[in-house]
């Protein structure tokens, strides 16, 4: 049983192993608890526990059983009754151990052994169980950690997805922005087309004029011939006339004789001739009369007409200009002349002066009027307004001030508050110019007799001068003020009696009744303070307030208002903002001075009550007497009362008798005058007076607080009383910075605001948060307070600490009236808050559509009194007005403001869409410049955050952006040079809106095509605006909208001008057209437009090539390799084939590639098999044959085509040629006229015997420096860039543009250098550069591509060309130098490669120096030490650029066949510099300064070896000369642009008489550091020809030495030592030295 129990565990562990098969026994031994799962461990534990329990039971049973067996075995056979058995027991017990039986034979021993084993197993199991539990705990902890890691992984994955989404949105956003910009491109393209249309018209006109000119020339020629003929006739006639003249002279002589006779007879008959004079006199009179008539009708009449015209014009002009020019406020300092006198003077002057002279400048008027001294009477008349008699003159007189100049703004901070409507009331505010104040003082002191009648009487009839509108309105103001004050005071005072006078204050007359425009006060020389003036009157529609009739009022009102509108700089709803911003500090200074004077004046206890009727002449009534409850703002005096009639005003419900008090004004109070705390026109009760002011000067302790409370509560009476306290700070601010004016404006107490403003409270005083009273009033919607504050020059654009302007606060709270007032005042709609919100954000945030419409559509009125003349339009018809605006006018806000994003990137459209304000979103979307795809900082568009309704709206409003692509059809694969051509190019994205019509769509497509063709053919990276003016017809490639064969919208064909039933919007959405594809006409249609677009060869040139083929039948295209000869010939053949097939002729193209093994017999077989050559006896067929022979440069033209020259020139039987067939028979053949032959030669120029063939063919030379090849690469790469940017032209500073420009420059510089070296066989066409990669942001890819191109194509060609030229003139024994070049030739090749690499390739690379260093090693030959070139001067021409810097600029001695004028003009003045800059990277910079001493000897060594090694070949010498020249003065002028450190530069001059060639080399291994040998600038270099240098200087080539930074010498010299020590030749030594010059170009 125990055995079975012990075997439970192995059985359990064996169960899974048995299933595994063979390794069950091994698995049982390798049973590992760690591999079990938790459930399996639990099961194992339960099994173990059960086994242990069973084992315990078995043990107990076995123990009992053992005891029984022991007893039975030991004592069972014995019995106490049997002594023998007892003896036997004793014997057995006493026996020795050895004699006992083995224990193992006893079952109990076996059981004990089993139990001991079980105990050991139990202990082992418990140990394993404990280990398993610990591992289980560890596993649980690891699982928890794994779960945490998984959660973190999920979070990171989510963030990764979010970042990917953001990046995707950013990409989409950029793409959409590109599309939007393409829309702008379309608009500008339309302008371009218009300009082009005008240009075409001008061309047509020019051609017509040229034709007319030619016609005129012919006519002139004919007329000259006629003239010659007539002259000959005239000569004949002249001779005849001369003869006749002689006869007449003879006759005249006879007549003279007869006359003499007659005179004598007359004298005799004189006395009897009375009747004869009577006959002659009438004749004379008749003549004289005719003369007089002509004079009278012509001369005088003309003169009178002119005078009448001038007079009419001059007299009409003042009347015409009058509404704009009659001044309300004359210029500062103008003499206060009477209006009548002024008007008469001006009118009389207008009749005399020309109209031009009338436009005098403002300064002239001011200067001319300053010296005049005002007479008192004139001053008086001006103050009280023009009289009746002067009114007519005033209305007809021109203004002395230009209508566009504010009279006060040029010289004064602001007009005084009482000077709005007095024609001469504007006094200069400069301290020295105060005639206005002096006149006022004279008026106050000298007219006391009339003042009681005007100011103190109780009669209601106004004085006679009140016919003047100004004074009449002022009287109304006085009466209204008196009524309102009486109403205010009647609540707590005794009945009105009289006003208490102030001692010493002169009477004011009417000066104070003029409403103030600004708050700037005046300080008189005597210290007196001009009073703040009277508040304006209440509109006359209120009951009992209108006191005077106004019959002549309306006419003058129009004139005055219009003149005021035209004579002020800033208009705000008919309120003259008389003080420009620059005058605010001046105004504050004056006000502060006035406050100081107020605080220093003594305060006397006022009398409690004074009757106004008995007041002395010198008294003045306080502002309380003139305060008006609910009066209209100061800018609306009697001239505009009607405009205020419908405004709701705060007016007391009770009115007192208007006849009780006449308004007077407290003005010009002297410094010694006592100011009462409460002075009233009606008097005060004795019980109230002591409470307020009895017992001496009024205490000021709690006054500011009391002033705040009165203003906040709207207590007009108390506020007026406090304001008359002398020394009270009305601008006092409480703890939160609120002034009394701020409190009044915030609570909407218009009357209190007016009183405070009249008291000159600071209108722009801000609280601790930067809010002004205007901000508070606008935020609370108190539009009357806003209007009043604006009238007093409040800063409408003031921004609080958070950037909130009054307009922003008004929009934030939806106060339409305030918004309109502020907009009409000219506030800035684009001011932004601290978090980037504009008023448009605020209006949209509240969902207030009316506010948003006002912001977008409301314009400031053209005339300032528009609002007042049409009061009904003010507020109540706002919706209708704005709807009218939307329908008839465009939004006044720019697109930038509509699309402005706040600090979170949210535009107004985001806010409206996210809050579901669909109406606001619709208003925004009506703006044409809205960009609904603008994304916030979380990469969300307005559509992304919009509600469902707003999403639907945006989806319907957004324009569909469909890419427009140009396709040239499928390009046939093959070796036609078209491997890099693209079949399709995206040129732009078309914006299709709901309202887009098919006509608009056609125009957009046509315009986009025109713009694209113009863009890719322009010379630079011009924007479309620039191209409009910079493009010329020469730069065009000849493509236009007429080059289109077909257009497909998605998959549906469409033609320009075609219309479908659906609109373009619906059509594109219904058919799911993802793009518009334009297919250009190609060879299949007999056109070459697609070929032009694919290859960027101008259409005119391709058509010319085709014409040559059709006309001459034999055309050969030749040019450098890679000039697209094969592609051109194939496309021309295709076009010609389809043209012939269209004409009804069958046509076939036969291509043959010529190689070195191509024989003449093969060519004959080709011609015969293709039916080009036909037997003479056979008639030609109608079939057209086009034969293309490619790669003719691989064979000899004279050998291959020599026998065909005659027959090819004459395609007829007249020029037969006999060819022998393979069977030995010969037959005559001829080329029929339906045969065309085209050939291609990849060679820049013909040589040798091939020149004999030249005259028999028509040749098309594809030069690299002429069209079409010259601009082909630029156009091709430009189109590539445009395609990469999806139709947009990047800016010239874009890295992609710089990279493309660099690739283009590499091609040009390479060819320029190669042409200059006389190696035309190495010239490259643009084909190799067409594959230049255009990858925005990855210029390294282009550099890598360039290195591959250099290593695979350019370097091998250059090497082959240099070697071939260097060995051209060598002796036959040296003919193998090309295969086994000499050391000198190798040096020349390597030098040439290095120079080309650095001057033509690496020069101008857009990469930074550090990046370029990494790629330099990829170029073959880039690390060549250029000092070797210096030694092998005849061989190393090109690689020496950095090392040698030869100065010789004499013409290179070239072989004649290589010389070309264009090749001799290197464009390398800048490239050479760059080459040395690059090569210095390859130079070790370890040279020590001690090497400078041996510099001159090293130079001699270099030049000596230069000469010795140049003896091998003249061409090598030429090469070396060119290499030296390329490295010398051509680029030295730009060294300053390259050198990094100019502080350590050293110059070493070489003497011209140095015996360089005779120098011997004593130490070949001496390191020559030509870093120290620095070429001089071009003006310091020695320039001479070879002959000159040899004879005069003894030097054929003089080195130029550039300055070298000393810090870079050390490494190069050490490198030189290492290199030179490894060779026994001088060449290698100098090679390394030559390499040292490279850093000089840095």
Curated annotation (Swiss-Prot):
Keyword hit for Phosphoprotein: yes
GO CC annotations on file: actin cytoskeleton; cell cortex; dendritic spine; FAR/SIN/STRIPAK complex
UniProt keyword Cell membrane, yes or no: no
ANK repeat residues: 702-732, 736-765, 769-798, 802-831, 835-864, 904-934
Its job: Regulates the dendritic spine distribution of CTTN/cortactin in hippocampal neurons, and thus controls dendritic spinogenesis and dendritic spine maintenance. Associates with the striatin-interacting phosphatase and kinase (STRIPAK) core complex to regulate dendritic spine distribution of the STRIPAK complex in hippocampal neurons.
Gene3D superfamilies linked to this entry: Ankyrin repeat-containing domain
Region annotation (Disordered) ranges: 1-27, 203-222, 366-433, 446-471, 491-611, 1441-1469, 1545-1642
Domain of life of the source: Eukaryota
Protein name listed in UniProt: Cortactin-binding protein 2
Annotated Polar residues bias: 385-394, 576-586, 1552-1563, 1571-1588
Coiled-coil regions listed: 119-276
Organism: Muntiacus muntjak
Origin organism lineage: Eukaryota, Metazoa, Chordata, Craniata, Vertebrata
Modified residues (Phosphoserine): 1513
Subunit structure: Interacts with CTTN/cortactin SH3 domain. Interacts with STRN, STRN4/zinedin and MOB4/phocein; this interactions mediate the association with the STRIPAK core complex and may regulate dendritic spine distribution of the STRIPAK complex in hippocampal neurons. Activation of glutamate receptors weakens the interaction with STRN and STRN4.
Low complexity bias: start-end ranges: 395-407, 1613-1627
UniProt feature, compositional bias: Pro residues: 497-506
Sites of Asymmetric dimethylarginine modification: 491
An example Gene Ontology molecular-function term: protein phosphatase 2A binding
